[in-house]
């Protein structure tokens, strides 16, 4: 969201980004747009979503605005109602197929609630964008909404000076269900370099328990949430990146994770799940080793082969930096600004 808000602010729009304040929240840095965090007593579950959406509704209700953008389904209800009350333009920024995430689709009662919200609201968000064409096609199929594709890709820096690579494997991003930690962490028993995990999420405690059960506390290192500059440096130092998802949930199958491009811009080859969007990009640019099987054995084999094949690693790393010249935020920003220009002038 920082990239989108910065681009809009630099184009002359007055932008306010609203989120939640948590005990583990990193302090806000000065940005060219306004930032607001809402405090909630509850931190998870139904009580949290009810409280956050209520607080968000009343906050938005008393703000002046010409348009409102809901970021994923968990903030769409207050955005929908406020836009109706104020009679303003509403936009949907869908990072994923929310209802098809494993933590949603495997819980029938929770799934029914979120699907009801989706059916009630999304058809009214006729303007929007998402991260890839398959997800855009799903929204058009389900609700007749024709959303643009804007990928959350890193800014291209032609003058960046990358630090020397260190032989460690990096996972960065949400530590959530269905990211294959159950097989990735045990795989490290058979890989002679450390795994560094940067981020937090609903699977963090389970991931730490898996690490302890496998006796890998010295090899699997949890860094938690890092400041953007710290995470960028950590990524640039990494030798191999990880982009894995469990098969089954359609949200995973149609995903396009931000970290895929973060690794790419840092010249870091990655082990990546062989799903359609990643396959299409890799067929064109060859920046990753794709795996069909996310078992511990398969992950360990892919990691060791890339660790031991210096020529292949160098080829993939070089391809990453070459691909970054065309796969970058400067190109995506043009599409974003065109959408907002059409809506607001």
Describe the predicted segments one by one.
Residues 16-19, 115-160, 220-223:
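Donor nucleotide-sugar binding/catalytic pocket of nucleotide-sugar-dependent glycosyltransferases
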Residues 129, 161-196, 317, 336:
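Conserved donor-binding/catalytic core segment of Leloir-type glycosyltransferases
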Residues 284-296, 305-310:
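Conserved acidic donor-binding segment of nucleotide-sugar-dependent glycosyltransferases
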Residues 6, 54-62, 77, 81-85, ...:
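Membrane-proximal helix-turn-helix segments that form the acceptor-binding/catalytic region
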Residues 235-253, 268:
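Acidic donor-binding loop of glycosyltransferase active sites
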Residues 208-233, 240:
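Nucleotide-activated donor-binding/catalytic signature segment of Leloir-type glycosyltransferases, i.e.
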Residues 47-54, 89, 98-120, 156, ...:
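Nucleotide-sugar donor phosphate/pyrophosphate-binding loop at the beta->alpha transition
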Residues 298, 305, 312-326, 338:
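A short, well-ordered alpha-helix in the C-terminal region of glycosyltransferases
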């Amino acid at each position: 969201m920082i990239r989108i808000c910065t681009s809009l602010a630099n184009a002359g729009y007055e932008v306010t980004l609203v989120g939640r304040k948590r005990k583990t929240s990193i302090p806000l840095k000065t940005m060219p747009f306004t930032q607001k965090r809402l405090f909630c007593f509850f931190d998870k579950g139904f009580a949290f979503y009810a409280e956050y959406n209520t607080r968000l509704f009343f906050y938005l209700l008393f703000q002046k605005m010409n348009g409102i953008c809901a970021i994923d389904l968990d903030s769409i209800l207050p955005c929908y109602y406020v836009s109706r009350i104020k009679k303003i333009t509403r936009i949907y920024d869908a990072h994923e197929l929310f209802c098809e995430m494993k933590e949603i689709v495997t819980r029938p009662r929770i799934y029914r609630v979120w699907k009801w919200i989706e059916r009630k609201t999304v058809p009214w968000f006729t303007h929007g964008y998402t991260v890839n064409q398959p997800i855009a096609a799903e929204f058009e199929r389900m609700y007749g909404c024709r959303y643009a594709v804007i990928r959350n890709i890193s800014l291209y820096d032609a003058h960046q000076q990358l630090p020397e690579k260190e032989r460690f494997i990096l996972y960065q991003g949400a530590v959530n269900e269905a990211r294959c930690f159950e097989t990735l962490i045990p795989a490290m028993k058979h890989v002679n370099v450390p795994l560094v995990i940067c981020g937090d999420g609903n699977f963090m405690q389970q991931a730490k328990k898996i690490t302890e059960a496998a006796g890998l506390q010295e090899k699997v290192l949890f860094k938690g949430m890092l400041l953007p500059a710290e995470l960028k440096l950590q990524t640039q130092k990494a030798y191999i990146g990880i982009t894995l998802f469990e098969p089954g949930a359609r949200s995973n199958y149609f995903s396009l994770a931000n970290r895929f491009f973060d690794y790419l811009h840092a010249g870091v080859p990655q082990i990546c799940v062989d799903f359609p969007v990643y396959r299409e990009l890799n067929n064109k640019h060859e920046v990753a080793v794709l795996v069909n099987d996310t078992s511990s054995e398969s992950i360990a084999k892919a990691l060791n082969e890339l660790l031991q094949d210096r020529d292949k690693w160098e080829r993939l790393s070089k391809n990453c930096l070459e691909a970054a010249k065309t796969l970058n935020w400067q190109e995506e920003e043009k599409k974003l600004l065109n959408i907002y220009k059409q809506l607001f002038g």
